[in-house]
Amino acid sequence: MDATTPAQTVGVEIYLGPVWPAPSNSTPLALNLSLALREDAPGNLTGDLSEHQQYVIALFLSCLYTIFLFPIGFVGNILILVVNISFREKMTIPDLYFINLAAADLILVADSLIEVFNLDEQYYDIAVLCTFMSLFLQINMYSSVFFLTWMSFDRYLALAKAMRCGLFRTKHHARLSCGLIWMASVSATLVPFTAVHLRHTEEACFCFADVREVQWLEVTLGFIMPFAIIGLCYSLIVRALIRAHRHRGLRPRRQKALRMIFAVVLVFFICWLPENVFISVHLLQWTQPGDTPCKQSFRHAYPLTGHIVNLAAFSNSCLNPLIYSFLGETFRDKLRLYVEQKTSLPALNRFCHATLKAVIPDSTEQSEVRFSSAV
């Protein structure tokens, strides 16, 4: 395609990419990222796909997500909530944080069925519905990343400042922290919404998710800053671990809690990185003069790419229960006891016990003993 001609459209309604070349005031970084993301750029696989082919690929990926990941996320997060609440008297501080994280994940997983089959991006053309869905998703996205950030900081206090901060690391303060995190998540969403809504009330196709200031805030407050804090916490934790091994060693319980939280943070980073890179590339592109707000939406500009990064982000909420089940020793013990209590028939009890023992190989006799060593 000649560099002086505008990007071609594929199909009837889907706009595949911005006009190229970009305006003269664009930065080299924005130009390179724009070309890299273009769905009709050389080397980009989606550039040669028709509208129907992109729809089929998106539908196939949505079906894979619904068949394999959605049941794990939906049932797994419910189990985390039900089992831990059933044994609330034996709940540790990390368990309390994971319960709140599971609540946020469960809401995201339930909402994901609407998102993953929104293949034509139709509800993004309805201003009220688009704004409502965006508010709903952002609150739970912020709560997830805020809980992960606070859990990393809590691990640092438990390992490096145990003597100094022991009086403050109580269940009462943990519950108070959870309430403040939920309030911060709601505020981080509603305050910008109120501000931008007053400026865009006259726009027929206004959607909260498409406002550039909101997108910058989402990338900065929901990804860059939290992971900078998490990285700092884990660097300090590593230093504390090295010192602990030199002197007296580290309690196995705390090692396992640290390993589980690190795994959750790593999976969150991998799943949400594509979404934030996608939004950042869109933000670095200069708005074309005369473009309507609807056409500026990156969801309309790159439908297949946007659908893929959405699926990756939702996958995080489905994978957390797996991490919690396989790395959370206390939860495995609680799950065994919960199943044994709820299965009254002897044959069914033996079957469930054997199944759990095969899936989670660990001796059940040690379950009650391990409950006593709370973090």
Swiss-Prot record:
Glycans are attached at N32, N44. GO terms for biological process: adenylate cyclase-activating G protein-coupled receptor signaling pathway; apoptotic chromosome condensation; cell differentiation; cellular response to estradiol stimulus; cellular response to glucose stimulus; cellular response to mineralocorticoid stimulus; cellular response to peptide hormone stimulus; cellular response to tumor necrosis factor. Residues 85-96, 154-175, 237-259, 328-375 are cytoplasmic. Residues 1-62, 121-132, 195-220, 281-306 are extracellular. One of its GO terms (cellular component) is endoplasmic reticulum membrane. It is a multi-pass membrane protein. Disulfide bonds join C130-C207. Its main location: nucleus. Expressed in brain, heart, spleen, preadipocytes, mature adipocytes and primary hippocampal neurons. Expressed in neurons of the hippocampus, hypothalamic paraventricular nucleus (PVH), supraoptic nucleus (SON) and the median eminence. Expressed in the nucleus ambiguous (at protein level). Expressed in brain, pituitary gland, adrenal medulla, renal pelvis, ovary, endothelial cells, visceral fat tissues and islets of Langerhans. The chain crosses the membrane at residues 63-84, 97-120, 133-153, 176-194, 221-236, 260-280, 307-327. Induction: Up-regulated during adipogenesis. Keywords: Acetylation, Apoptosis, Cell cycle, Cell membrane, Cell projection, Cytoplasm, Cytoplasmic vesicle, Cytoskeleton, Differentiation, Disulfide bond, Endoplasmic reticulum, Endosome, G-protein coupled receptor, Glycoprotein, Golgi apparatus, Immunity, Inflammatory response, Innate immunity, Membrane, Mitochondrion, Neurogenesis, Nucleus, Postsynaptic cell membrane, Receptor, Synapse, Transducer, Transmembrane, Transmembrane helix, Ubl conjugation. It is found in: Nucleus; Cytoplasm; Cytoplasm, Perinuclear region; Cytoplasm, Cytoskeleton. Disruption phenotype: Strong variations in phenotypes, probably depending on the distinct targeting strategies, genetic background and experimental conditions used in the different experiments. According to PubMed:18063692, mice are viable and fertile and do not display any gross physical, immunological, reproductive and neurological abnormalities, but show 17-beta-estradiol (E2)-induced alleviated thymic atrophy. According to PubMed:20734455, male mice display increased body size, femur length, bone mass and cell proliferative activity within the growth plate. Ubiquitinated; ubiquitination occurs at the plasma membrane and leads to proteasome-mediated degradation. N-glycosylated. The modification N-acetylmethionine is found at M1. GO terms for molecular function: chromatin binding; G protein-coupled estrogen receptor activity; nuclear estrogen receptor activity; steroid binding; steroid hormone binding. InterPro entries: GPCR_Rhodpsn, GPCR_Rhodpsn_7TM, GPER1-like. Interacts with RAMP3; the interaction confers proper subcellular localization and function in cardioprotection. Interacts with KRT7 and KRT8. Interacts with EGFR; the interaction increases after agonist-induced stimulation in cancer-associated fibroblasts (CAF). Interacts with EGFR and ESR1. Interacts (via C-terminus tail motif) with DLG4 (via N-terminus tandem pair of PDZ domains); the interaction is direct and induces the increase of GPER1 protein levels residing at the plasma membrane surface in a estradiol-independent manner. Homodimer. Belongs to the G-protein coupled receptor 1 family. G-protein coupled estrogen receptor that binds to 17-beta-estradiol (E2) with high affinity, leading to rapid and transient activation of numerous intracellular signaling pathways. Stimulates cAMP production, calcium mobilization and tyrosine kinase Src inducing the release of heparin-bound epidermal growth factor (HB-EGF) and subsequent transactivation of the epidermal growth factor receptor (EGFR), activating downstream signaling pathways such as PI3K/Akt and ERK/MAPK. This is G-protein coupled estrogen receptor 1.
